[in-house]
Amino acid sequence: MKFVLVLILLLVFLQGCISPTVKTGDPSRYELPGIANTTIFYLNLSSVQVINNVVDRASVDYKIEDSIQTFRFPVAIDYSGNNVSMNVSIISIMAKNYAHLNFTANFSGFVAFTMPGGQDFTYFPTDNSTIRVVLPENFTTATIFLGYIQPKPDNITKDSSGREILVWNNAQNKKIKVRYHQNDTPVMLLYLFGSLLVCALIVWGYYHYSISALKKKRETLEKFPRK
């Protein structure tokens, strides 16, 4: 009897606990449709919009790295651009949270959702699809010490809005890391260092002038013998 109870508890633990459902979003907030066999990440300082190609799936799971409240506004559209209904819930498996999207029938099209953003982006692909990372407008990864890309992309291009796009083909099991910054950040830093240098020169000049003035005053006093 105890063995059966332990087995039941183990099965529940492995299958996960289902949390309340997540409200779906509006497809108009995303740059849909996506691209076949591709996952696209539109980076932003406050959020990341993800568009993932799904082929003939009754359900799909997405790992949630942060709190469960950070998985927001999920939508699904088919290849014809029609909005597809789905149930979205949060499940916990082996102490890890996943967003579970369940469709009424096998679905092919694009799933989009929003997750937290920032100037540092990390993603570990688990399949062999193409990964596209789109930086915000007027941002880049090009300046050493301020930005970096790991591993080296297979292609770097720009879209019609001038946004930088990083592309990895067959990126399975390659941890992708991107840090980006504003295009004018190096110039701003140059101005800052220049201002600090000018201030340092002013302080040095004032110090040198004060020392010289005191030295002359001492030499003048030494010319007159003490009585």
Show where each model-derived region lies.
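Hydrophobic secretory-pathway targeting helix
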Residues: 1-27
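Lumenal/extracellular ectodomains and adaptor appendage modules
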Residues: 17-226
